[in-house]
């Protein structure tokens, strides 16, 4: 006990996602980006934050992408990856829920933005939110440290089982 449930800060902050409907053919009529917030997703959500999609330690993108079944088995309805920068880079290709915190609104609300640095990177964290939007768990990791799939899945298990 001791951890009181509270609504996830910044859950209504508008993040951008590459529009899955977008294609070169439809570029004229379809915006390349959609605005979504964490509140727009339903169910039990595991939010994994990464500094950016362009930088170091990008194998975490593949870890998440290739192990979606493990997250689902751990009880997560949605796995949402939030980055600070470079949503257009190749690292995040194939991740349906890759969002960029363009205005750093989500990062600031959750104290994930780097202190005193003019960078847009977000610190690494795994944040679980239940179906009511309440934050159940948060596990921060070292900015430059790569997490393992086991560690990320364990966070979901702890939160949702």
Where are these regions (language model features)?
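Chalcogenol-based redox active-site neighborhoods
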Residues: 3-161
């Amino acid at each position: 006990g001791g951890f009181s449930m509270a609504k996830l800060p910044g859950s209504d902050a508008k993040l951008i996602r590459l529009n899955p409907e977008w294609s070169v053919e439809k570029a004229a009529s379809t915006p390349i980006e959609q605005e979504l917030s964490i509140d727009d997703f339903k169910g039990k959500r595991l939010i994994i934050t990464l500094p950016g999609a362009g930088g170091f330690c990008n194998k975490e993108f593949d870890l998440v992408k290739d192990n979606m079944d493990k997250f689902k088995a751990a009880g997560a309805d949605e796995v949402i990856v939030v980055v600070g920068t470079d949503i257009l880079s190749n690292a995040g290709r194939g991740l349906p829920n890759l969002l960029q915190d363009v205005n750093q609104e989500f990062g600031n609300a959750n104290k994930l933005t780097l202190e005193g640095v003019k960078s847009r990177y977000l610190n690494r964290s795994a944040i679980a939110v239940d179906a009511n939007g309440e934050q159940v768990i948060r596990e921060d990791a070292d900015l430059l440290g790569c997490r393992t799939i086991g560690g990320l899945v364990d966070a979901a298990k702890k939160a949702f089982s």
